[in-house]
C-alpha cells in the first residue's frame, strides 16, 4: 500500500483526488498500526529482524507519503534507531550517495 501512496502522492503526473485521499489515508492507518506494534519494543518482532529490514525502506520515504513521523512517536524512535545502523547507512547510499532523511 505504501507503494501506491508513493505513486499517487509523489510521482503521479495526473492528479486524482480519490487516489490521493485513498492511499494517503491508508498510509496514515498503516503507520498507526506500526506505531502500536512498536509500543514497548525496539523492533517490530522484538529483536532486529527481516520484518524491520522489509518495512524500514518504505518508512524512509515518509516524505513521499506525506506522513509526519512526529505524529507516530514509536515509529519515529524505531526509524531513528535503524537509520543509525552502519549497514543501513551504507546501504542507503546505493546506487547514489545520499543522506537518510531524519525528521
What are the language-model segments listed below?
Residues 1-41, 63-65, 100-102:
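Conserved C-terminal alpha-helical bundle
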Residues 26, 37, 78-81, 91:
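Residues that form generic nucleotide/phosphate-binding pockets
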Residues 17-21, 25, 70-76, 86:
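Generic alpha-helical secondary structure signal
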Residues 34, 52, 82-88:
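Residue-level signal for nonpolar/aromatic packing positions in well-ordered secondary structure
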Residues 36-47, 87-91:
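Surface-exposed helix-capping loop/turn segments at secondary-structure junctions
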Residues 88-103:
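Terminal-tail/helix-coil boundary detector
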Residues 2-6, 43-71, 76, 81-82:
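GST superfamily/GST-like fold recognition
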Amino acid at each position: 500500500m505504501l507503494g501506491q501512496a508513493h505513486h499517487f502522492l509523489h510521482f503521479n503526473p495526473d492528479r486524482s483526488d480519490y487516489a490521493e485521499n485513498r492511499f494517503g489515508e491508508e498510509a496514515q492507518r498503516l503507520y498507526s498500526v506500526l506505531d502500536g506494534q512498536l509500543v514497548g519494543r525496539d523492533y517490530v518482532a522484538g529483536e532486529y529482524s527481516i520484518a524491520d529490514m522489509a518495512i524500514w525502506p518504505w518508512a524512509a520515504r515518509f516524505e513521499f507519503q506525506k506522513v509526519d513521523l512526529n505524529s507516530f512517536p514509536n515509529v519515529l524512535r524505531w526509524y531513528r534507531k535503524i537509520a543509525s545502523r552502519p549497514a543501513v547507512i551504507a546501504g542507503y547510499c546505493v546506487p547514489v550517495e545520499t543522506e537518510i532523511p531524519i525528521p
